Amino acid sequence: MAEVLRPEMLDISNDTSSLASPKLLHVLAVDDSMVDRKFIERLLRVSSCKVTVVDSATRALQYLGLDGENNSSVGFEDLKINLIMTDYSMPGMTGYELLKKIKESSAFREIPVVIMSSENILPRIDRCLEEGAEDFLLKPVKLADVKRLRDSLMKAEERAFKNIMHKRELEANDIYSQLKRAKI
């Protein structure tokens, strides 16, 4: 008599190491002002975030490997960015232009991008939000802003994790049903 297979006996991978841990978010902070960079870095670290800081949009693209050259500082598989926070007004390339390049990238378009600026210019804010910015924060950024962003991202990561685990459970049950019908 054949042994009946149950879902827990199936070799369905439960390895979730490739999924982002909702405990420590990795933020890429982009600002040409050293004072603002240090300030946002401090706020993010106090909020339990891993932080990588760069001083320009060009350096951010290099870090992400989106500069068209193969000189990224890290390998793609090691690069898990949960959020990009960028100043709007920077020499060379604005935060808006960086946002557009990120949203054009198939590898990074899903990463939320937050634009920061000391200038409260409504058409600029609207343009950034229409282009796909997650939020637009006025400087100086407050700890409450960072905590709100972090909490929102952690909830989104948790929902994504639960959705993946639910999908895997449904797949296992489907395989189990198929095997049961086939009487294997």
Curated annotation (Swiss-Prot):
SMART domains: REC. GO terms for cellular component: cytoplasm; nucleus. Predominantly expressed in roots and shoot apical meristems. One of its GO terms (biological process) is regulation of DNA-templated transcription. Signal peptide: none annotated. The keyword Transcription regulation applies. Functions as a response regulator involved in His-to-Asp phosphorelay signal transduction system. Phosphorylation of the Asp residue in the receiver domain activates the ability of the protein to promote the transcription of target genes. Type-A response regulators seem to act as negative regulators of the cytokinin signaling. This is Two-component response regulator ARR5. It comes from Arabidopsis thaliana (Mouse-ear cress).
